[in-house]
Amino acid sequence: SLSVSCMTYEASTVSDAVGSDGDDALRTRMMRYTVAAMFFAGFAGKGIRGIFGDIGSLMPMLILLVSFVVLFRISGRSLLLRRFPTTTCLFVAWCALSCAWSVAPLLSAEYTVLSVSLTLVSIAVAVALPLTELVGALILAFQWIIGSSFVLEALVAFFGHGPLAPPIMWGRGLLPASYYWIDGLLLKGGPIQGFPGNRNPLAFVALLLAVCLILRYMQTKRSRLATFLWL
């Protein structure tokens, strides 16, 4: 009877450990996808604003922020003062101090609040994920941007009639060339705007994706085919 009880206790302990590891893996995966979505919103924010508008785009960003905070808390992470990088904090503090001699102090104060908020979120993201997972989240976000960009460009090139305006500008008639979201030049070999609606940020995202993929492959030596295809 004692032997059976010991075996039952050991099995229960192993089961609890496996369940705990599974929960941790699930939380890490959810955190990675949430951070990837935040990176997507950051690097392709113009496309999101083109869909929802300047005010409406705050809603998906707020949902992402709340999701991140909840996951950050339930994962047991915390923002300790020693985790704050000194140089970054000094720079943000100096920018905040500039409100004292700014010609537009109220506007400077608004941007100071925004800078402080973004700095806190950035530090929290760095604390929430280890470096390998953080690079993985960046790669995911960049792949989503590049993938959605080619899908949009292909749809407009094959089925569209001329350039595509962002949804918030539909029904406004002819627009200036710089206002259009997708130019539909994919089949003509012209430059593509992609989901960000601007060729320059899209090219920057493509470059960052290439750098992250190469660094991850050099570190892990895995996913050679997928890395090659994305490059």
Predicted regions: what they are:
Residues 4-74, 97, 101:
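N-terminal signal-anchor transmembrane segment
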Residues 103-155:
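Transmembrane alpha-helical segments and their membrane-water interfaces
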Residues 48-57, 101, 105-111, 198-200, ...:
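Helix-loop-helix junctions and helix-breaking kinks within/between transmembrane helices
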Residues 139-167, 171-231:
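Alpha-helical transmembrane segments of multi-pass inner-membrane proteins
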Residues 34-37, 41, 62-66, 86-97, ...:
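Lipid-exposed faces of alpha-helical membrane segments in multi-pass integral membrane proteins
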Residues 26-36, 76-91, 137-142, 225-227:
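Membrane-interfacial loop-to-transmembrane alpha-helix junctions, especially the N-terminal start
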